[in-house]
Amino acid sequence: MKDLLIGTSTRYEWNQLKNWAKSIKNTSFSGDVVLVVMECSVETVKTLEEHGITVVPVNKTLDYKSNTPVHVERFIHMYHYLKNNEYRYVISTDVKDVIFQQNPIDWLEENLDNKKIVCASESIQYLHESWGNNNLMSAFGKYIHNEFYEKEIFNVGTLAGEHKYIKDLMLHLFLASINRPIPIVDQATYNIMMHTEPWSTITKQAKSEDGWACQLGTTGDPTKLEIFKPHLLENIPVYKEGEVYTSTGDLFYIVHQYDRVPDLKAKIDAKY
């Protein structure tokens, strides 16, 4: 059975998608690469398809009773695609700020063990990350904030696992994110799920040092690292000639938020 890499895009052009698209093709990944698009130029669609990316326009006939921002709406469209297409492993990532340095399927086969999903740590707790901490409070209020503000943060932009579990995770993320007091709630919703049953039992909570995915918004951003570093739960990534490694020298499979590190972004842009 085939594997899948899936992402979503709205109003992104090829220049914003090329690093994601080209980098996965630069690995040994042999599964389907699908981009669900809400709005996209004909020229960009053509270029994506020329690079082996399957472009899936959103199904505008779906009636899901929601007027949500695109970063929440994306989950129902990915759920709809997964409901109608069967795979073994499914990898879902952001697309504008993600690249692949190795085939992510290799990591899943070697490390997922008896778990069904993998989530990627941001290497910091909510109480030490002001944006996330405020977002959690604004999305769910004081009671829920008090329950979770000491928890480790996991990033919703780099998740993966077995098909049926990722499919249903997409549905639950959508359902739990709609009708909230603020529009940006997907990250807070995801973290509450990852820290509660049944999700916490079936999910491998991957540290940055496990090499699955680095989250450079907290572990690499030079404008924030001085503030975050005393509170980080593990060592920070290392850069070598435009590649990103764990502190022990293992090449990351996925690099997320590389655009937060200007020198690294310049090298990645030049490569792809």
Task: Identify the meaning behind each predicted range.
Residues 1-73, 77-88, 164:
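N-terminal anchoring/stem segment of glycosyltransferases
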Residues 9-13, 123-125, 259-261:
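Short polar catalytic/cofactor-binding loops
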Residues 13-17, 128, 264-265:
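Short N-terminal binding/cap micro-motifs at the start of the first secondary-structure element
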Residues 30, 87, 114-116, 249-252:
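Short, high-confidence coil segments that cap the C-terminus of an alpha-helix
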Residues 75-132, 167:
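GT-A fold catalytic core of metal-dependent nucleotide-sugar glycosyltransferases
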Residues 130-131, 262-270:
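Short conserved micro-motifs at the rims of enzyme active sites and ligand-binding pockets
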Residues 134-150:
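Short, flexible, basic/aromatic active-site loop/helix in glycosyltransferases
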Residues 148-266:
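Catalytic core and acceptor-binding pocket of nucleotide-sugar-dependent glycosyltransferases
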